[in-house]
Swiss-Prot record:
Gene3D superfamilies the UniProt entry points to: Peptide methionine sulphoxide reductase MsrA (3.30.1060.10)
Record-given protein name: Peptide methionine sulfoxide reductase MsrA 1
Function: Has an important function as a repair enzyme for proteins that have been inactivated by oxidation. Catalyzes the reversible oxidation-reduction of methionine sulfoxide in proteins to methionine.
Residues of the active site: 12
UniProt-listed Pfam families: PMSR
Stored InterPro entries: Met_Sox_Rdtase_MsrA_dom (IPR002569), Met_Sox_Rdtase_MsrA_sf (IPR036509)
Keywords per UniProt: Oxidoreductase
GO molecular function: L-methionine:thioredoxin-disulfide S-oxidoreductase activity; peptide-methionine (S)-S-oxide reductase activity
PANTHER family membership: PEPTIDE METHIONINE SULFOXIDE REDUCTASE (PTHR43774), PEPTIDE METHIONINE SULFOXIDE REDUCTASE MSRA 2 (PTHR43774:SF1)
Amino acid sequence: MSTERAIFAGGCFWCMVEPFEERPGILAVTSGYTGGHIEYPTYDQVLSKASGHTEAVEILFDNELISYDELLDIYWSLIDPTDADGQIYDRGANYRPVIFVESEEQRIAAQKSKIALEKSGIWDKPIVVPIEEAKTFWPAEEYHQQYYKKDPKRYQAMHKARERYLALQRFKGKFKFLRKNTR
């Protein structure tokens, strides 16, 4: 077994855990904060937008069972990559989408994946997700961990609203792509 780490930010971390955690080869998914200047940040500090941190998930995975490229594919399916100022209803820099890379190999894979998404025509606006060097990851408070199990009804409502929003955004992008290419 060869363990690797990935860190992705994509809005509220509550909606980022289950889609990764259910995959074979995933060893752990932790909700937390990264990218800021305060050590041991709390949820309230991150929410205040004064810490510089972004909500994110840290994923430990067995790269013999699931690849970093597969994780990138899952990540892109969970976010609106054209929105740099948060995701869906969660607005501000603390909810911005970011791919935090651990190595040059991850950076190259993330860049290739981003370019492929841009060329796909799925989205009608530029892909604006930055690729940044990973910094210290601070686990969030326990009540945030595996939220989908702790409050399944609320999680399902949030998850379904997010899926509907993303489906609509993708449809709008495909419709514009089709109209542009049939003229």
